Amino acid sequence: DHRCRIVWRFVESLDLEPFYETIQVTDSKAGRSSIAPEILISLWLMATLDGISSAREINRRCKTDLIYMWICGGVSVNYHTISDFRCDHVEKLNDILTSSVASLIKQGFVTLAEIGQDGMRVRAAAGSSSFRRKPTLDELHKHAKAHVEALEEERRRQDESNDDDDDPPSRTRREAAADRAAREREQRIARAIEESEKLRDKKRKDKEKVRTSTTDPDARRMKMGDGGTRPAVNVQFASDSDARVIVGVEVSGDGTDGGKLPPMLDQIEDRYGIIPERALVDSAYATQASVQQAESVGCAVVSTVPRSEQLRRHGKDPHQRQRRDNDEYEAFRKRMAEAEYQELYKKRPSVAELPNADCRNRGLTQLRIRGLTKATAVALWHALTFNLLRMVHMGAIA
């Protein structure tokens, strides 16, 4: 079987009732038929498998590629519908991830006794030059707001001059697009000012140096894998240690992984009602606050001890209690001195980094959309695609 048939069988097994609830087309009324969600979901899963992130490219393949034509089954689609569907159903995609993993738990493929978590920084759809300081943002917002008001006044005068005409001309697409672009720019700059205030409140010093992007206010400058600093978002995946299936997804504007483990444990409990017994993470996650929160809910953190080499250079044992350690962190240090847990930690790359590497290979390197909500939707499409391949490997899909 071609993998497009596997994709279709997987989609057929899903509960898509929430997608159908939003469709308002009926047989008794005139109008264009709505496109079945099975088609649009299959198109995006197939495109993600092929490393395609462009809605226009998918639309082109629906007309020229037999695989995509087979998925459409003679139904006409356009790039706008495909593009909107990618990001308009974040909650429903989250539900699909939850229900599909819950099914694997029921079948015994996934236990969630042990998870791995790792993050990757994905280039945002914003330029480095779009980051501005607060005074500049205020000035830009004033000009953008004045521009919107000027356009509204111009449209009002046009409407008044056309009142006496028997057949007044309707607003052109170009005028409507100009109005929409002006409003969206004003809204983005306003969001950038809000984000700038939040960042300034968090910083203890150099508050005046805080910059936010007018293109994507949710993007942050982050240090990337090649050593460069670029606008990006932080995509976090948590995966089951046995099945290597993604069980949790989070997207944020934080440039570090510190503090990301407790929210992921909460997410897993909310999704499946299970708290993992162990979490395999690198030392960036093993902050004292994170270890304390994880241990308090019954999850043992398995990681290298932060600053081990520095402590050894000063003649200290990193696996013994240090000044300012709490009881949970002392237990973590002593646990990681045991050979059993050091051997267990060696599994971390194959558990935590495998999903990241696979998604990178399928194009999760540069976002085409803006905002954390839409970025979460893209991350969920990649998670569902990765899990689909794992299900095929495990024999969970016939």
Question: Where are the regions that the model predicts?
Answer:
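Helical catalytic core of nucleic-acid polymerases
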Residues: E17-F19, T26-R32, P37, R61-G74, ...
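Basic, short loop/linker segments at the boundary and entry of helix-turn-helix/winged-helix-like folds
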Residues: D1-L45, D50
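Generic anion/oxyanion-binding catalytic loop in active/binding sites
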Residues: A47, I71, E250
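Anion-binding and metal-coordination hotspots
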Residues: G51-T64, V75-A398
